[in-house]
Amino acid sequence: MNKSFLSIIFFILLQLGCSGPRELIIHPRSYWDASDPKPFKRHIPERITIHHEGTIFNKSDDAPKHIKKVQTWGMGKDRNWVDIPYHFLIDPNGNIYEGRNVFTVGETATEYDPTGHLLITCMGNFEEQEVSDEQLEALIKLIAYCCDKYNISPSTIASHKDYSKQTVCPGKNLYKYLENNFIKSEVEDLLLKKSRL
């Protein structure tokens, strides 16, 4: 079964079975050839935490291949994580990829406990790169979808560095949209529009 067909199926399931923003497309784990996870610790997502993946990544780069490398690295002997660390990943073209199970506690290389955090990462290094318009738009739509689907308040939207003194993640060029409340305001607007339908 090819990747395009799987993505179409996943999109249809999202349309029929979910109540979040309707234009959202999430590529399933099979799209990037995910390995099966190891046994994991469960949690209930209660807040949204934004990351950047931390490596320079451009629109022309192969996102599925890179995501697979991130999973392989994370599950390797140096980290020994149960899966890719994030619940969702967004590439610079605005494509969204399913990461680990949302009800699995995510991973971090810093000191904060990610239990209860739904981890969304934007692919790139936003200390050095700007966030693309497509990536920012996809991030806002995905957060609104997750807030709606998992009953998470937009007031919980924060970043990795808000919980850890050991990192600048998600980078100054993404963090500025949290500092000025742009992301939170846009998410709240999407949720308000949905509530009026």
Q: What is each stretch, according to the model?
A:
Residues 1-2, 46:
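Generic cytosolic/nucleocytoplasmic N-terminal low-complexity/intrinsically disordered segments
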